[in-house]
């Protein structure tokens, strides 16, 4: 049926309660650090949602590579066709140009995918319920971000109430360990954890070399500079 999520690459359908953490892993810098935290504290399971975004294949490659490096064996890749069909974002509609960081402005940018994180969380919470996991990790960040409304603390407080009231046992908690951190702090934390930044992908528009000019690339480059660290991925413009 058109628009329904499809699921692939699930290495295990185990329902063991030892999977205490499910982490949403896009393949970007923030989600990579979040995954490193989850893998440190739990036997984690990782879920990746593809939704027809411009860099879909590159992000999926990053997801698999990060899982290998962090030794996360239990993985779920879900394709959500609905977000691509709905459109309304430069990430899913090729007729809408991806703006450079200097042209983003003060309002919510066109790279915002409408209510995207709700789709992601629904998948992760459902899987957590099957696995018996009690925590769902997501690398949402409010400071030094593009200003997306689904990256605010109030959003996750509300979604935690949804998870509490809408699951069988009501014990699943959405965890946002990075939400109040500056990007440079996230880089430093990732380096301490051994997060594989070399495998991550943040660019909104390109899959060969990161463009270096979209909002996501610029925020990432500034973060590494502020942290006094080297960004290990390649850029077309730096």
Task: Identify the function of each model-found stretch.
Residues 206-207, 227-238:
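Short cysteine/histidine-rich metal-coordination sites, predominantly Zn2+-binding motifs
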Residues 172, 198-203:
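Acidic interhelical loop/turn segments
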Residues 167, 225-228:
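Short amphipathic alpha-helical interaction/hinge segments
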Residues 122, 201-222:
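Local cysteine-cluster metal-coordination motifs and their immediate loop/turn environment
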Residues 5-6, 90-91, 231:
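Polar low-complexity intrinsically disordered regions enriched in Ser/Thr and small residues
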Residues 12-194:
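ATP-dependent adenylation/nucleotidyltransferase module used to activate substrates
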Residues 1-2, 6-17:
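Short, basic, low-complexity termini and linkers enriched in Ser/Thr/Gly/Pro
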Residues 100, 195, 222-226:
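A polyampholytic, Gly/Pro-enriched intrinsically disordered region
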